[in-house]
Regions:
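Conserved N-terminal alpha-helix of the aminotransferase class I/II PLP-enzyme fold
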Residues: 39-89, 93-94, 110-117
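Conserved C-terminal alpha-helix-loop-beta "cap" of PLP-dependent enzymes
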Residues: 280-356, 360
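Structural motif of enzymes handling amino- and sulfur-group chemistry
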Residues: 36, 232-305, 309-317
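PLP-dependent enzyme catalytic core of the Aspartate aminotransferase-like
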Residues: 1-6, 127, 257, 320, ...
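Acidic-histidine catalytic/liganding microenvironments
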Residues: 72, 272-276, 322
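Conserved PLP-enzyme active-site core in the AAT-like
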Residues: 2-14, 28, 78-274
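A common structural junction motif
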Residues: 235-236, 322-332, 375-380
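N-terminal "arm"/small-domain region of PLP-dependent enzymes with the aminotransferase-like
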Residues: 2-60, 65-68, 356
Length: 380
C-alpha cells in the first residue's frame, strides 16, 4: 500500500481507517468542477462500446456503491440486490440442485422462509445447527455445499464463532456465507474470519434511514462474483439508481451512527436489568450473555436489544404505549423501533411470545429510556 498523501480517496491503496473510508470512498474523481457526490444516473441504456450497455447489467450509481461496499468489506467485489432477501436468495441459488445447506436453527424469518420453501420444493436439503460460541457442527457439515452463519442471530441474539465455523465448513468442502447485517463492516469484516460470502440487508444499518430497501453480497472469489452477477442479470434482481444513491448517502454517516446506537443500546440493556418486570435481557454487550466474550472480541455487541416480560399481552401493550420509540418492524435506522417479534405469524415458534425487540437509534439515551420506562411501568 502507498503512503503517498496524494493518493485520492477512491484509490484502493488508501490506508485510511474505516470511519474515514465510509465518508470518502465511492466519490467521483476530484477533477475541477466535478461533483462531490456520485450522480444519480437515470438511464435504461448506454452508448455502445463502453463498460455498460443495458441498465439491467449495470449502472454508474450502482458501481460507486458496490465499489464502496467492497472496500469496506475488504473484498474484491460486491454486488447489490433489490432487497436483503433477494441477496440471500441469490446466494442460495449457488447451491447445486439436490445439495445440502447447513443453517442455524433460528435464523432471520426471511432466511427461514426461503430455506423452508426450497427444501419443500426439493431444491436442496437443510440441516440445522444450534449456534453457540463453541459449536461443533462437523457432523452436520458432512457432504454439505453451503454453511449459513448469522451472528448475532435475529431476534434471539445468539453468538457464533465465525472463524471456527468457517474452518469446519472448509474442511468439509463447503462454502461459507454470513448474514452480517447486525455487524456492519464498521465493526468487523467477516471475510477476515474465513467467510466466502458476506450478505447484508443494506436497508438496515448500512443505509440507516429507513427510506430504501436493498441487499448486497461481497466476496473475494471472482468465480462466485461472476455467478452472482449472472443470477442477478438473468433474474432481473437489480436496484434502482435512486436507492443506490440513498444507500451511499447513508453509508457516509455509518461510523457515527453505529457508535451512538451501540452506546445507547448498552445503556438501555443495563437499565432493563434493574426492572423486576423484565424476566430476561438478551444483549451481547452484557457480561451475563453466554456469547459476550466472543462477541466483544470479534463482532461487537450491536445495537439490537431484546427483553422478555411476563406475558405476550403485556409485551404487546408495552410496544403500543411508547411515544418516542416507533412501534414498527425492521431495524438499523436512526430512529428507535420497538415490536413484539412473535406478533408475526412467520416468526420461528421458538421465539418467545413475550419477547420485545428494540432497534436502538441515535436519539438522546435518557429520552429513550424515559419513554420505554413509562411504557413498561404503565403495564406492570
Amino acid at each position: 500500500m502507498s503512503n503517498d498523501p496524494s493518493v485520492p480517496p477512491t484509490s484502493p491503496d488508501s490506508e485510511w481507517k474505516i470511519s474515514t473510508r465510509t465518508v470518502s470512498h465511492g466519490r467521483p474523481a476530484p477533477d475541477p468542477g466535478a461533483p462531490v457526490n456520485e450522480s444519480i444516473t437515470l438511464s435504461s441504456t448506454f452508448h455502445a462500446g463502453g463498460p455498460l450497455d443495458y441498465g439491467r447489467v449495470g449502472n454508474p450509481t450502482w458501481t460507486a456503491l458496490e465499489s464502496t461496499l467492497a472496500d469496506l468489506e475488504s473484498t474484491q467485489s460486491a454486488l447489490c440486490f433489490p432487497s436483503g432477501v433477494a441477496a440471500i436468495s441469490a446466494v442460495l441459488d449457488l447451491v447445486p440442485v439436490g445439495g445440502v445447506v447447513v443453517a442455524p436453527a433460528h435464523p432471520y424469518s426471511g432466511t427461514r422462509g426461503l430455506l423452508n420453501e426450497r427444501q419443500s420444493a426439493g431444491r436442496f436439503t437443510v440441516r440445522e445447527y444450534q449456534p453457540s460460541p463453541t459449536a461443533d457442527i462437523s457432523a452436520e457439515l458432512q457432504g454439505a455445499d453451503l454453511l449459513w452463519i448469522e451472528t448475532p442471530s435475529n431476534p434471539l441474539l445468539e453468538i457464533s464463532d465465525i472463524a471456527g465455523l468457517s474452518q469446519q465448513a472448509h474442511a468439509a468442502g463447503a462454502l461459507v456465507a454470513i448474514d452480517a447485517t447486525f455487524i456492519t463492516p464498521y465493526i468487523a469484516q467477516p471475510i477476515n474470519f474465513g467467510v466466502d460470502l458476506v450478505v447484508h440487508s443494506v436497508t438496515k444499518f448500512l443505509a440507516g434511514h429507513s427510506d430504501g430497501i436493498m441487499g448486497s453480497v461481497a466476496t473475494n472469489s471472482d468465480e462466485l462474483a461472476t455467478r452472482l452477477h449472472t443470477i442477478r442479470t438473468l433474474g432481473g434482481a437489480i436496484v434502482g439508481p435512486f436507492e443506490a444513491f440513498l444507500a451511499l448517502r447513508g453509508i457516509r454517516t455509518l461510523g457515527v451512527r453505529m457508535d451512538r446506537s451501540i452506546a445507547n443500546a448498552q445503556t438501555i440493556a443495563e437499565r432493563l436489568l434493574t426492572l423486576p418486570v423484565v424476566e430476561k435481557v438478551r444483549y451481547p454487550g452484557l457480561s451475563s450473555h453466554p456469547g459476550h466474550d466472543l462477541a466483544m472480541a470479534t463482532t461487537g455487541a450491536g445495537a439490537v436489544v431484546c427483553f422478555e416480560v411476563h406475558s405476550a399481552d403485556q409485551a404487546e401493550a408495552i410496544a403500543e404505549s411508547t411515544r418516542l420509540w416507533t412501534h414498527a418492524t425492521s431495524l438499523g435506522g436512526v430512529e428507535s423501533l420497538i415490536e413484539r417479534r412473535a406478533r408475526w405469524p412467520f416468526e420461528h415458534p421458538d421465539v418467545p411470545s413475550n419477547l420485545i425487540r428494540l432497534s436502538v437509534g441515535i436519539e438522546d439515551v435518557d429520552d429513550l429510556w424515559n419513554d420505554l420506562y413509562q411504557a413498561i411501568s404503565a403495564h406492570s
